[in-house]
Amino acid sequence: MHALQAKILDPRLGRDFPLPEYATPGSAGLDLRAMLQQDTVLEPGQTLLIPTGLAIHIADPTLAALVLPRSGLGHKHGIVLGNLVGLIDSDYQGELMVSCWNRGQSAFTIAVGERIAQLMLVPVVQARFELVDSFDSSDRGAGGFGHSGSH
């Protein structure tokens, strides 16, 4: 398991609410919580930037973190991430913030301490462009946007 440097910015985190943790031994993401000052209503179509009370520094340039939505919030309530996926670079050291967007038809209350997203560490492979005049041919070629499927 990798070590991840973290600073608690909201004293309720770790005291009143658990620190981010894996829900099961097979979980890929650590749950992030809404460290709001009070319960907040997210109206249909509204986007809100929500603090997690936690700053991290991954430090290892071969790793990054993704902030991903929680499937139940999106499927049952229409609450998804405003930026769809958040990318946290290894050299970022600020507070993790979650952009929540209510794409549903009903207002939704985000409770203080509610699990609103998940953080997943992923490997990073950096590349440099190698400029060429042409590519070796492939079965797919330049086909895209549904080219390989039936719909």
Swiss-Prot record:
Pathway: Pyrimidine metabolism; dUMP biosynthesis; dUMP from dCTP (dUTP route): step 2/2. GO terms for molecular function: dUTP diphosphatase activity; magnesium ion binding. It catalyses: dUTP + H2O = dUMP + diphosphate + H(+). It is an enzyme of class 3 (hydrolase). Keywords: Hydrolase, Magnesium, Metal-binding, Nucleotide metabolism. Substrate binds at residues 70-72, 83, 87-89, 97. It holds the Pfam family dUTPase. Its cofactor is Mg(2+). Its EC number is 3.6.1.23. It comes from the Bacteria. One of its GO terms (biological process) is dUMP biosynthetic process. Gene3D superfamilies: 2.70.40.10. Belongs to the dUTPase family. This enzyme is involved in nucleotide metabolism: it produces dUMP, the immediate precursor of thymidine nucleotides and it decreases the intracellular concentration of dUTP so that uracil cannot be incorporated into DNA. PANTHER family: DEOXYURIDINE 5'-TRIPHOSPHATE NUCLEOTIDOHYDROLASE. This is Deoxyuridine 5'-triphosphate nucleotidohydrolase. The gene is dut.
